């Protein structure tokens, strides 16, 4: 019998999180903690950072999706995460397009390969 797979967690604006919840990613762990955070205008940076760190420490989460503009608010926490699991992916939001220049994970990945490696 195969083991249970890992979850996708989402930190984002209401539209982003709602879209993923409608897609079926919403879960509660055994302690009744959700795998998502809706960031609203009154959500503090500490709340975002605490939730991100909680997601990092959960063994049932394999991927964390975060709106890039929110990732900018807690960039130091994202940059400190060096492990491959959970993978952290920055995604665009309806109001904020994706900017590859701001994506620290993409910059790190680019540094791992040279042009020769890609031939």
Swiss-Prot record:
PANTHER family: V-TYPE PROTON ATPASE SUBUNIT F, VACUOLAR ATP SYNTHASE SUBUNIT F. It is a peripheral membrane protein. Keywords: Cytoplasmic vesicle, Hydrogen ion transport, Ion transport, Membrane, Synapse, Transport. It is found in: Cytoplasmic vesicle, Secretory vesicle, Synaptic vesicle membrane; Cytoplasmic vesicle, Clathrin-coated vesicle membrane. InterPro entries: ATPase_V1-cplx_f_g_su, ATPase_V1-cplx_fsu_euk, ATPase_V1_fsu_sf. This is V-type proton ATPase subunit F. It comes from the Eukaryota. Subunit of the V1 complex of vacuolar(H+)-ATPase (V-ATPase), a multisubunit enzyme composed of a peripheral complex (V1) that hydrolyzes ATP and a membrane integral complex (V0) that translocates protons. V-ATPase is responsible for acidifying and maintaining the pH of intracellular compartments and in some cell types, is targeted to the plasma membrane, where it is responsible for acidifying the extracellular environment. GO terms for cellular component: clathrin-coated vesicle membrane; cytosol; endosome membrane; extracellular exosome; Golgi membrane; lysosomal membrane; membrane; plasma membrane. V-ATPase is a heteromultimeric enzyme made up of two complexes: the ATP-hydrolytic V1 complex and the proton translocation V0 complex. The V1 complex consists of three catalytic AB heterodimers that form a heterohexamer, three peripheral stalks each consisting of EG heterodimers, one central rotor including subunits D and F, and the regulatory subunits C and H. The proton translocation complex V0 consists of the proton transport subunit a, a ring of proteolipid subunits c9c'', rotary subunit d, subunits e and f, and the accessory subunits ATP6AP1/Ac45 and ATP6AP2/PRR. Belongs to the V-ATPase F subunit family. Pfam families: ATP-synt_F. The gene is ATP6V1F. Its main location: membrane. GO terms for biological process: endosomal lumen acidification; Golgi lumen acidification; intracellular pH reduction; lysosomal lumen acidification; proton transmembrane transport; synaptic vesicle lumen acidification; vacuolar acidification. It comes from Homo sapiens (Human). One of its GO terms (molecular function) is proton-transporting ATPase activity, rotational mechanism.
């Amino acid at each position: 019998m195969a083991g249970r797979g890992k979850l996708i967690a989402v930190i984002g604006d209401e539209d982003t999180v709602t879209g993923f919840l409608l897609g079926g990613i919403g879960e509660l762990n055994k302690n009744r903690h959700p795998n998502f955070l809706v960031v609203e205008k009154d959500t503090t940076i500490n709340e975002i950072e605490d939730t991100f760190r909680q997601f990092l420490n959960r063994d049932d989460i394999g991927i964390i999706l975060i709106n890039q503009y929110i990732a900018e608010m807690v960039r130091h926490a994202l940059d400190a995460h060096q492990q491959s699991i959970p993978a952290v992916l920055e995604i665009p939001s309806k109001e904020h397009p994706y900017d590859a220049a701001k994506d620290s994970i993409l910059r790190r990945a680019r540094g791992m390969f040279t042009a020769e490696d890609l031939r």
